[in-house]
């Protein structure tokens, strides 16, 4: 694949790898649309009303085929956008090219340097003729943090941000506590139709896909440590066990640890398993989960990867002085002084997007339908959202699920008036309290 780095000119407001990939990208976007019923339903519902007319959205989320469907949905609903990727390895260059060919300002390519990554984010915050954003759409919190720290003058015109992932939500709550958050935020991650679907079912498929593409290793019979048993860890553990691995879990939370034990997993510590496991997967959203000391103990040819947002769950920095042998894109062997080799996937960054193509379109339709609804909420009803961190109301969460039922052949039972009265709900929902745990 060519990588001639198409850059912006007087008539081209984008920076991507190769515009010649656009036709391939467009074909895959059209296929993805058939698997994203939630977004397509929003297009049909709002194509005339244009509820995002006047919105100028700066987006920072993995520039994939599925994200292309999201971007074009936002635009069909009236928004203008400028976009970068939230990970240096996650861009699908044909997706970026397909959008750039249509004149959409995209600043993303697979294999950015750190410096290029931040320059791409900066490019989304200002455009021709004084363009600046009045909404943000973020994944991981880098766009939000960059805006607050480097461009505070923009904050007074920003109606809010919708945040996609656990790591970004943690950062939002920290900023709110510190008083540095200057606009409202909607926590999309904690919508049930995001966290219980994207995080769990998405990872259940994309983790194995990425390990297989990267290594061709036999999963059956392997001892695998999954660090973290939240929704992401749960999905990873399910798929690894289904392939015949013996799965071990590390956890800090006694509730999650007990859940893992009740599912039949061994709950252990990294210190206990570092010298005996074959594959290690971090899924915590935290730092220093696999340390240099752990990696010194690991056996030859152990595989190390991360499916959390950032690259600090595994202490990759401590390996930089060792010899690295590249096997293929995003697959490296790190050779220790004693000759031992560890296989490191995606340099410790998101393995499912570095070594594969991320989650399937259908589950991303759940997440991205939430994102569109969050953007509409922030744009249409700013008076409802003083500075703070919010989740979408239950009726919208249920609506997202409802939009996806037909695609999987599911039919709902309808409550009678008597039944609805008996349990104290409206026949049309919401059917659960805000505090219900699915």
Swiss-Prot record:
GO terms for biological process: L-homocysteine biosynthetic process; one-carbon metabolic process; S-adenosylmethionine cycle. NAD(+) binds at residues 165-167, 199, 228-233, 251, 286, 307-309, 352. It is found in: Cytoplasm. Binds 1 NAD(+) per subunit. The keyword Hydrolase applies. Its EC number is 3.13.2.1. Substrate binds at residues 64, 139, 164, 194, 198. The keyword DNA-binding does not apply. SMART domains: AdoHcyase, AdoHcyase_NAD. It catalyses: S-adenosyl-L-homocysteine + H2O = L-homocysteine + adenosine. GO terms for molecular function: adenosylhomocysteinase activity. Pfam families: AdoHcyase, AdoHcyase_NAD. InterPro entries: Adenosylhomocyst_ase-like_sf, Adenosylhomocysteinase-like, Ado_hCys_hydrolase_NAD-bd, NAD(P)-bd_dom_sf, S-Ado-L-homoCys_hydrolase_CS. May play a key role in the regulation of the intracellular concentration of adenosylhomocysteine. Belongs to the adenosylhomocysteinase family. NCBIfam families: ahcY, PRK05476.2-3. This is Adenosylhomocysteinase. The lineage of its organism: Bacteria, Pseudomonadati, Pseudomonadota, Gammaproteobacteria, Legionellales. The gene is ahcY.
